[in-house]
Swiss-Prot record:
Binding site for S-adenosyl-L-methionine: Q265, F294, N299, E315, N342, D363
Active site: C389
Name of the protein described by the UniProt record: 23S rRNA (uracil(1939)-C(5))-methyltransferase RlmD
HAMAP family: 23SrRNA_methyltr_RlmD
Phylogenetic placement of the source organism: Bacteria, Pseudomonadati, Pseudomonadota, Gammaproteobacteria, Enterobacterales
UniProt source species: Klebsiella pneumoniae subsp. pneumoniae (strain ATCC 700721 / MGH 78578)
Sequence positions that bind [4Fe-4S] cluster: C81, C87, C90, C162
Molecular function terms, GO-annotated: 4 iron, 4 sulfur cluster binding; iron ion binding; RNA binding; rRNA (uridine-C5-)-methyltransferase activity
Keywords: 4Fe-4S, Iron, Iron-sulfur, Metal-binding, Methyltransferase, rRNA processing, S-adenosyl-L-methionine, Transferase
């Protein structure tokens, strides 16, 4: 979700003031009022009073840092992670989960000018099945740093635990660090990516120089000992599969094989609920033709095909289109057609646009889908489900449907990333009958 402030920074005197926070924004910042404008203060919750130092003063808003908290909210909780406040991964571990969801729900409602009907959430801890950890060898200490970037900085926070990771990946962290620290090429390691597939964990190691045979042997032994699939990435475009079987996950009971480079939702529990909700909202009938835009490798497309007459998936990444086709065949689905097309170009010239559809689902990236919204109107589907990772572009694109006579029937906030400022959502639009 983007913030809309762009005025030039104004010099402050680092004045110390006492404020009472009355709201929490979706990013976990406390919101107070000072001299008639919003004052954002990280680390302070609604109804808490604090002494703060003004550090930024703009025409429409100001920012401050906490000097001393004077009162505590009953919604305050002790952060579970020892790295919270330094690591840039989480911003809201100090706030209760109900408060986090309430603030995100309120922000979504304000943008959409409508009450939020549902909050779709899963486990608040141990939910993340994918993580990329930066690696950096420190010559002075002769130690390998492994962790996440600091908030608003490039420095690496060495992590020994991460409670938002699924337990299988969190348990691997010490062993991965020990293994990588024992490599002779540890000065040439870029990052390590860990993914928990349904058939076990996998590790991708990015290295910037060739690994000697002894290092490759150590890594292969490590992957065998810990039952994980191993991939090496000597270049960003190259992926070498060293050990283990291809990873897969399930979506509505279907098995989707993926490459470590492919996009998958990091929160499996919420993803499963999201897919089921989309299927329910679309109210699919056996005779329906369904269009799935920005379909990826078929996270929605394939489950849709188990309930509809025919499904068309459109995606801009060639590798994902190929994976979608392979997974359709693997699951015995012959009523699916995938198209590789750039949906930011003139879609009216694309082959899929010549077909008619009864229902449409779209799941675009943060930029939204301004280029395809007019064509969706021309298709005149009875129902449209829009899944969004950016409520600002969702609100913009929704106006196109609303002005064309569609109505919002359901609005849900997806708590895909607890303890962070990320806000995802999904909306059901239905065409008004004339």
């Amino acid at each position: 979700m983007a913030q809309f402030y762009s005025a030039k920074r104004r010099v402050t005197t680092r004045q110390i003031i006492t404020v009472t926070v009355n709201d929490l924004d979706p990013f976990g910042q406390g919101v107070a009022r000072h001299q008639g404008k919003a004052l954002f203060v990280s680390g302070v919750l609604p109804h808490e009073q604090a002494e703060v130092v003004l550090v930024e003063d703009k025409k429409q808003y100001a920012r401050a840092e906490v000097k001393r908290r004077l009162t505590d909210s009953p919604q305050r909780q002790a952060p579970r992670c020892p790295h919270f406040g330094v690591c840039g991964g989480c911003q809201q571990q100090h706030a209760s989960v109900p408060l986090q969801q309430q603030s995100k729900r309120a922000a979504l409602g304000r943008l959409m000018k409508r009450e939020v009907d549902d909050v779709i959430a899963g486990a608040p801890w141990g939910y993340r099945r994918r993580a990329r950890l930066s690696l950096n060898y420190q010559p002075k200490t002769q130690q390998l740093q492994m962790g996440f970037r600091q908030a608003n900085a490039k420095a690496i926070v060495d992590v020994v635990q991460c409670p938002v990771l699924v337990p299988q990946l969190e348990a691997l962290l010490p062993a991965v660090r020990e293994c990588l620290s024992a490599l002779s090429a540890l000065r040439h390691l870029g990052h390590v990516e860990l993914v928990q597939a349904d058939n076990g964990p996998l590790m991708v190691l990015r290295h910037t120089a060739a690994l000697p045979a002894t290092d490759r042997e150590k890594l292969e032994r490590f992957s065998q000992t810990h039952g994980l699939s191993l991939y090496l990435a000597p270049q960003s475009e190259i992926l070498e599969h060293i050990h283990g079987e291809a990873p897969w996950y399930t979506s509505d009971g279907l098995r989707l094989v993926f490459s470590p480079r492919d996009f998958i939702q990091v929160n499996d529990g919420v993803n499963q609920q999201m897919v089921r909700t989309a299927l329910e909202w679309l109210d699919l009938r056996p005779e329906d033709r369904v269009l799935d835009l920005f379909c990826g490798m078929g996270n929605f497309t394939l489950p849709l095909a188990t309930r509809a007459a025919h499904v068309v998936g459109v995606e801009g990444v060639p590798a994902l289109v190929e994976k979608g086709r392979e997974n359709a065949a693997r699951n015995g689905l012959s009523n699916v057609t995938f198209f590789h097309e750039n949906l930011e170009e003139d879609v009216t010239r694309q082959a899929w646009a010549k077909h008619g559809f009864d229902k449409v689902l779209l799941d675009p990236a943060r930029a939204g889908a301004p280029g395809v919204m007019p064509h969706i109107i021309k298709l005149a589907p009875r129902r449209v489900v829009y899944v969004s990772c950016n409520p600002a572009t969702l609100a913009r694109d929704s106006e196109t449907l609303l002005q064309a006579g569609y109505q919002i029937q359901r609005l849900a906030m997806l708590d895909m990333f607890p303890h962070t400022g990320h806000l995802e959502s999904m909306v059901l639009f239905e065409r008004r009958l004339t």
